[in-house]
Amino acid sequence: MKKLPIIAFGALIIGFLALCIYSYNQNQQYDQWIASLARSKYIEKDERNGNLGDNYEGSKDAKALIVEYADYQCPGCATTFPYLSEIVEEYKGKVGLIFRSFILSYHKNGTAAAHAANAAALQGYWQAYATILFKNQSEWEDLEAGKRDVKFKSYFEEASKNQGNADQFLSDMNSEAVKKKVKSDMAVAKLVNITETPTIIINGEKLPTISVNESTFKKTVHEMIDAALKKAESGSSNNTK
C-alpha cells in the first residue's frame, strides 16, 4: 500500500519533466521561426503570429519598405505616423510602410491599444483604426480598462464607418490570435535590438535619431527612400534581414 503514493509521486515527476521538455522544445521552435524571418520585409501570416501578417500601408512588395516599430501610446509615434502615411501616398506604389508594435512597459494602455489595432486588422480596418488611435491618443492613454474599451469600441465604429462587427472586435481584442500577433511583433523587435519608439528602418537602414519636426523628419526620410529606390533600381537592393 505504501508503494502507491511513491508510484503516484514518480508519475507526477515524470509528467512534470515531460511538460518542461515539451515547453522548451516549443520555445526553441518559436525562436528559430522568429530568427528565420526576413525582418526588413513583409512578414506573412502564420499560425505563430495568429494568422495576422504585418500591418501595412501602400505596397507590401514595394522597392522601398519602411518598417516602423512603434507604440500606440508613444507621443513621438503619434507625431510621425501621419508623416509616414503622407510619404507612402506621395510615392504611389514605390514605397510601403510596415508597422510592428514595440510596447514600452511604462505605457499604461500601450498593450491594450496594440490589441485593439490588431482586432481591427482582423476585419480589414487597421490603417483607419491606427490613424484614429494616434490622433486621439490623449483621450485614452490614462483611462481605466472599462472606459478605455468603450472608447476603443467607438473608434472601431468610426474606422469601419459602422460597417464592422463591434461585438466581434471586442471579443478579438482578447483573442489568442491577437495575443500571438503582438507577441511576434515584440519578438522581432527584440531580435533587431529595438530599444525606443519610433524606430524606423528603410530597406534595412536605420533612420538616425532626429527631431520629429515635420520638415526635418520628412527631408531625412525622403533622402533615405530616394537612396533606397536608386539602389533597388540599379539592381543592388538590400537583401539584409
Stretch-by-stretch model annotation:
Residues 26-42:
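Ser/Thr/Pro/Gly-rich low-complexity linker/stalk segments immediately outside membranes or between
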Residues 67-72, 78-160, 190-192, 220-223, ...:
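Structural alpha/beta surface segment adjacent to cysteine/selenocysteine redox centers
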Residues 64-65, 197:
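Short loop/turn microsegments at loop-to-beta-strand junctions
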Residues 1-24, 157-241:
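C-terminal cap of thioredoxin/glutaredoxin-like
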Residues 56-57, 140, 173, 207:
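Short clusters of hydrophobic/aromatic residues that line enzyme substrate/ligand-binding pockets
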Residues 47-64, 89:
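A short beta-strand-turn-helix
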Residues 77, 106-107, 179, 215:
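Loop/helix-junction capping segments adjacent to catalytic residues or to phosphate/diphosphate-binding pockets
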